[in-house]
Each structure stands twice: as C-alpha cells, then as structure tokens.
Amino acid sequence: MTRLSEILDQMTTVLNDLKTVMDAEQQQLSVGQINGSQLQRITEEKSSLLATLDYLEQQRRLEQNAQRSANDDIAERWQAITEKTQHLRDLNQHNGWLLEGQIERNQQALEVLKPHQEPTLYGADGQTSVSHRGGKKISI
C-alpha cells in the first residue's frame, strides 16, 4: 500500500468519526433542552477531527504532487472522500441552523424573563420605577 493510499484510508476513518460526532451534535441541538457540557465536549471533538483532517489533506497534496500517477484505486477513494465531505458540509450547515434556532429560543426566553427580574415599585411621583439594587441613585 502506498503512502497516498494510507493517507486516504486515514481520511476516510476521520470522516466517518466526524459523521458520528456531527450526528451526536445534531441530536443535542434537536432536543428541547441542551446539555451545555455535552455540546462543548462534542464541539471540542469535532474541532480536533477537523484539525486532523486538515493535516491529512496537506499530507495528501504533498504525496499526490510527488506521485502524479493516476491510479484508479486512488481515484475511487478520493471520490468517496469527496462525497463524504460534501455530505458532512451539508450536515454541518443543518446543525448550524439548529444552533441558530436554539439561540433564538434562548433569547426569546430571556426577553420573557427580563421584566420579572427586578420588582417594579412606585416612586414619589406615583409612577412605576424599577428599583436599583446595591446602591443609591446619584445625580450631579
């Protein structure tokens, strides 16, 4: 087996691992309540796999430039890697949309909770005002 074949096999393995991690990410983002620590672990694992894939891609280019002989087996492996990469790009985009939806729902929940954060009191003028905790209002 040539060095290029080994690199392509390693890339395939990393892409399969990345698919598993991205499926887990999608599952986390699809549930009603996200486990933050679990999502962070998944994100770190995904980043590590992407860094490994980037390194392998650099090695593949160096090796391929050195060989420059077209080989059917190599071409088939590269085609499979290209297809997996395109699928993972689409999956990552979908996960990004799910994450944006979660962020939007969290923002809406915060907006609902915000008015209830501090009690409303009546001021000397009879109008409602929000109390300021931890100090007096000073005007100069």
From Swiss-Prot:
It comes from Salmonella typhimurium (strain LT2 / SGSC1412 / ATCC 700720). One of its GO terms (cellular component) is cytoplasm. GO terms for biological process: bacterial-type flagellum assembly. It is found in: Cytoplasm. NCBIfam families: PRK15459.1 (NF012003). SUPFAM superfamilies: FlgN-like. Signal peptide: none annotated. It holds the Pfam family FlgN. The keyword Cell cycle does not apply. Residues 119-140 are annotated as: Disordered. Keywords: Bacterial flagellum biogenesis, Cytoplasm. This is Flagella synthesis protein FlgN. Belongs to the FlgN family. Gene3D superfamilies: FlgN-like (1.20.58.300). Required for the efficient initiation of filament assembly. The keyword Cytoplasm applies.
